[in-house]
């Protein structure tokens, strides 16, 4: 079963990108390679039990278990120690990636408070699109009555676009709500 977004890419985006940029080969058309969802636990970790809660929600959101990210060195002002868990991340590829992006664009983004579209500045020169989400509860998978805490996420969409312009066109054609500049 193919994702709606993957079908859209194969049927509409490839032909539109080939017409606009003049690619002679289909494989030269930029595509989304992976999505990385990560969160820094920071002060949440000081309370025991919050780690499991963060892992539970990230697993529900991404569809796979996130890996723990440990501090590489101790920093006294941040109250972190070497090896202490300071965040979690999940890298999503393939069919799961397209399913996540479909749910994200159609269900989660419209639930964001005061959302007017993502800024074009969120796309870097390498064609990667990074957006910060203040509340994890915008995802339909996290809806429940027993939400004890709210944490933010960072979603990075990695593409193999060679230029920023190619990436912006790709994301617009894929249905990402970008602001007009």
Feature locations, PLM:
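Ribosome-associated RNA-binding proteins
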Residues: 1-181
């Amino acid at each position: 079963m193919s994702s709606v977004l993957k079908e859209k890419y194969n049927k509409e985006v490839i032909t539109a990108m080939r017409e606009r940029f003049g690619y002679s080969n289909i494989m030269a058309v930029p595509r989304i390679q992976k999505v990385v969802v990560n969160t820094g636990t920071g002060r949440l970790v000081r309370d025991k039990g919050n780690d499991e809660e963060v892992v539970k929600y990230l697993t529900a959101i991404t569809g796979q278990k996130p890996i723990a990210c440990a501090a590489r060195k101790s920093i006294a002002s941040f109250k972190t120690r070497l090896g202490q868990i300071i965040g979690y991340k999940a890298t999503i590829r393939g069919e799961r990636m397209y399913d996540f992006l479909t749910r994200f664009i159609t269900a989660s983004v419209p639930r964001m408070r005061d959302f007017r579209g993502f800024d074009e500045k969120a796309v870097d020169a390498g064609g990667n699109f990074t957006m910060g989400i203040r509340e994890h509860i915008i995802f339909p998978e996290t809806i429940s009555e027993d939400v004890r805490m709210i944490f933010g996420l960072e979603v990075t969409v990695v593409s193999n676009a060679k230029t920023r312009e190619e990436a912006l066109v790709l994301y617009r054609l894929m249905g990402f709500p970008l602001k007009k500049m």
